[in-house]
């Protein structure tokens, strides 16, 4: 087993069930490779495993991967083992391919899972040539793919590199999207847009500056507003993500965030409930403040797959936070201007018509499940 949970709690994960023979801590690429090639478990760095006598052993940690070009292209594996048409994300063109150009994130957001558990806070990147070579392979060998998504935690962290990659993508003639922080300069955004950028996935999180300070977001709403306006001017679409229930949340800050979302007005949004994952600063804070009991599993989703509020406060209960989620979505989407924006897209594209109808069905299914 791999991932953030076992990276943070290898002992507890192995002790929880005999069904797991080993877990890969830290970065698991080459750990998995060595296990698959038959290396003795006791010799594999970064591995925790169950010994023949039933005891749990922890090998030395695996050094962090510095040369990201050592990683093989993932796109040929997609082509070999997956039918990409079977995978759908509402804000991306269909079908799409998702790849990473680097690992780690310089930001210190207290809630964010992967940089605090596996990837680290140093952005280690593949060379520009290596990235463009894989995108060219996708273009030439997977003609059905309509968009490439760069899934790095913050693809826009290194401006000159982003601009160089963008110019290379422009020459390849591909459509692409990426994760971005809401502080990318106008000139960089312009170069990205001119070279095939379609959409940015942006974590706004909250409309309250004190909450952004509390979670160490590294920017305030003034910067994000300017960024959003720049995207509008350039015709860059934005899928915005927000979080309810972060430290400092009140009824008033929730209202502030809903209004803020309507002001910056991404094309589409995702609203999450604060999740204190083990290994994150938010988890430690939640335990210290008594918002969460240590070592007690927090229910993050219901049996029906609907997300739940894991932490609450004396002045704002988990139940109240949970119900504000539905309110947020309704007030953002059920506006005449937003409805017309979506309908207008549908009228000019049969592909967009199918996508938005599918999203609409899923949205109303979510509302029914949430109300239940």
Task: Give, region by region, the residue ranges found by the protein language model.
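Flexible glycine/acidic-rich beta-alpha junction loops that bind and position SAM and/or redox cofactors
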Residues: 8-12, 107, 111, 210, ...
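Mobile, glycine-enriched helix-loop/loop "lid" segments at the mouths of ligand-binding/catalytic clefts
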Residues: 52, 56, 62-82, 283-305
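Structural motif
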Residues: 1-4, 179, 241
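Radical SAM [4Fe-4S] cluster-binding motif and immediate context
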Residues: 74-239, 246, 251, 259
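Non-cysteine beta-strand/loop elements that form the S-adenosyl-L-methionine
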Residues: 28, 189-207, 267-276, 296
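Radical SAM enzyme core and accessory elements
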Residues: 52, 281-284, 291-372
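Structured loop/turn residues at beta-strand edges in well-structured enzyme cores
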Residues: 18, 42, 143, 195, ...
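Glycine-rich beta-alpha loop elements in corrinoid/cobalamin-binding modules
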Residues: 1-67, 273-275, 279
């Amino acid at each position: 087993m791999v991932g953030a949970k076992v990276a943070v709690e290898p002992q507890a994960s192995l002790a929880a069930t005999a069904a797991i023979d080993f877990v890969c801590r830290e970065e698991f690429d080459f750990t998995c490779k060595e296990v698959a090639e038959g290396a003795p478990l006791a010799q594999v760095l970064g591995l925790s495993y169950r010994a023949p006598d039933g005891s749990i052993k922890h090998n030395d940690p695996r050094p962090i991967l510095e040369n990201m070009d050592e990683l093989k292209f993932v796109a040929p594996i997609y082509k070999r083992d997956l039918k990409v048409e079977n995978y759908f994300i509402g804000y991306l063109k269909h079908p799409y391919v998702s790849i990473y150009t680097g690992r780690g994130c310089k930001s210190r957001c207290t809630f964010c899972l992967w940089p605090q558990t596996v990837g680290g806070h140093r952005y280690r990147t593949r060379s520009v040539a290596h990235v463009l070579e894989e995108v060219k392979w996708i273009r030439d060998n997977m003609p059905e793919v309509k968009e490439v998504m760069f899934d790095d935690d913050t693809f826009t962290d290194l401006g000159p590199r982003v601009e160089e990659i963008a110019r290379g993508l422009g020459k390849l003639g591909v459509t692409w999207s990426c994760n971005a922080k809401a502080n990318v300069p106008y000139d960089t955004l312009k170069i990205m847009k001119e070279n095939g950028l379609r959409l940015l996935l942006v974590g706004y999180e909250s409309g309250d500056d004190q909450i952004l300070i509390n979670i160490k977001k590294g920017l305030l709403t003034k910067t994000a507003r300017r960024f959003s306006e720049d995207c509008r001017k350039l015709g860059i679409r934005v899928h915005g993500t927000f979080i309810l229930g972060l430290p400092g949340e009140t009824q008033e800050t929730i209202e502030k965030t809903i209004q803020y979302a309507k002001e910056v007005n991404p094309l589409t949004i995702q609203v999450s409930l604060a999740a204190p994952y083990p290994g994150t600063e938010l988890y430690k804070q939640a335990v210290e403040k008594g918002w969460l009991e240590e070592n007690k599993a927090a229910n993050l989703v219901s049996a029906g797959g609907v997300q739940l509020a894991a932490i609450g406060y004396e002045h704002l209960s988990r139940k109240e936070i949970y119900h504000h989620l539905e309110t947020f979505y309704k007030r953002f989407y059920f506006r005449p201007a937003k409805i017309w924006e979506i309908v207008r897209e549908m009228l000019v594209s049969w592909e967009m018509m199918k996508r938005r109808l599918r999203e609409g069905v899923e949205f109303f299914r979510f509302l029914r499940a949430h109300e239940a």
